[in-house]
Every structure is written in structure tokens, then in C-alpha cells.
């Protein structure tokens, strides 16, 4: 499951009339999958606590059934089918949301909130042909978020790193990141050629770079200090 959260906090300590707002987006999670909405097989106490102390909707609809389009709809308030590019994006796609567009982040900023986006993004970054070793712009900070800590692409795509306010977190400049979605890097393991390194068997499309024992989409080398650890 890939999670992302959008958070908005009042800028002023004295602004007690404004509640904190947290929006959690989860891939492949049905409304009936949490116990707050009736699931009796799986217990989700933390989500239930939020539901009990927040607002529950009983008639909600997603603008799309897939990742990028639904996130685009939530971010902009626009139907994703109105934008031909609002489809599942590759890991090195440029920022899908125009920096001039009004977004949910900008809405909260205009209302006096500090804003943050954390986790899976999947709305693209930069202007294409991303250099992961430099400042990446435009990204989330350009469309309404004061702070961002984002998965660079998706959990199954390279590079498997976090991007904090436009820069890869914990990156050693002496070990730069290289990413290619077409050609493997010599000497770097892949799911096809190195099955002994794979903890989870690959499926078609997910058979490229092996990172943390998991075969990914695309090829990557370098950036060892910045690679996330699924266990932590």
C-alpha cells in the first residue's frame, strides 16, 4: 500500500478556531477495508481513532480509480480526464500540475495555514530528464506546500529515494544517482539476471533493478546512502 498525506496547520498559535487538517491517500484501499467502516476481519485502530474524532463521509467518490489521475483530481479540483497527461506517470515525468493552477495546498495557504505533503506523490517533478543530484524544480513546493518529503517516483519505481523540498534526502555527492528506464547499468543486478538476490519474485515490468531484495521498474545505480529501507 502506498500512502501519502497532505497536512495543514494554522500558522498562528493563537488561531485556535482553525483545526488542523490531515488528508491521507492510500492506493488500493476500499472504503470497507477499515474497521471504522465495518470491516470485521482487519482491525485498524489508528484510523478508527481518527474517524471517531474527526468527520466520516458516507457518500464519497474518487475522480479516478488509479494513482496519478485521482491525485491530480484531489490536488486541483479538476476532473483528470480534462487533462490528457493525467494518466499513470513514469518515474521521471515532469510535474503534471501547472504552477499557475489553484491547488488544495494553495487554498490552505491562502487561509493562513502552513502546509506539507509527505509520502507518495506520483504527480511528476521538475521539467523532464531529472538530474536527481541537483535541486529538482518545480515540485511540490511550487504548487502550495511549504514542506515536502516525497517518494521520488513510486514504491515500485526507481529511484528508491525520498526527496525533501526538492533535494534527494541523505544523498552522498560522492555517490551520485543515475537512473535509466530503458537500459541497465553494467554490473548492477536485475530481477531477471540475479534471482538469488530477489526476496519477492518479479512479474512482467517489475524485473529491473533489485533494491532491498525487490525488483523494480527501471534501472538505477549509486545513491546508496539515500536508498530507503522498507523495514523502517
Predicted regions mapped to residue ranges:
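Formylglycine-dependent sulfatase
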Residues: 1-6, 11-232
Amino acid at each position: 500500500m502506498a500512502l501519502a498525506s497532505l497536512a495543514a496547520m494554522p500558522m498562528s498559535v493563537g488561531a485556535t478556531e482553525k483545526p488542523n487538517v490531515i488528508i491521507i491517500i492510500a492506493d488500493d484501499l476500499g472504503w470497507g477495508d477499515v474497521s471504522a467502516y465495518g470491516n470485521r476481519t482487519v482491525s485498524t485502530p489508528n484510523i478508527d481513532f481518527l474517524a471517531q474524532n474527526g468527520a466520516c463521509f458516507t457518500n464519497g467518490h474518487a475522480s479516478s480509480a488509479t494513482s496519478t489521475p485521482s491525485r491530480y483530481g484531489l490536488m486541483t479540483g479538476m476532473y483528470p480526464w480534462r487533462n490528457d497527461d493525467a494518466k499513470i506517470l513514469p518515474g521521471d515525468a515532469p510535474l503534471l500540475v501547472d504552477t499557475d493552477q489553484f491547488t488544495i495546498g494553495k487554498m490552505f495557504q491562502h487561509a493562513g495555514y502552513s502546509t506539507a505533503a509527505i509520502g507518495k506523490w506520483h504527480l511528476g517533478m521538475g521539467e523532464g530528464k531529472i538530474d536527481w543530484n541537483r535541486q529538482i524544480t518545480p515540485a511540490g513546493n511550487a504548487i502550495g506546500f511549504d514542506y515536502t518529503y516525497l517518494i521520488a517516483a513510486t514504491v515500485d519505481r526507481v529511484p528508491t529515494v525520498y526527496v525533501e523540498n526538492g533535494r534527494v534526502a541523505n544523498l552522498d555527492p560522492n555517490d551520485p544517482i543515475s537512473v535509466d528506464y530503458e537500459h541497465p547499468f553494467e554490473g548492477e543486478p536485475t530481477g531477471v539476471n540475479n534471482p538469488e538476490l530477489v526476496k519477492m519474485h518479479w512479474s512482467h515490468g517489475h524485473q529491473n533493478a533489485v533494491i532491498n531484495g525487490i525488483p523494480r521498474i527501471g534501472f538505477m545505480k549509486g545513491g546508496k546512502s539515500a536508498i530507503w529501507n522498507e523495514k523502517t
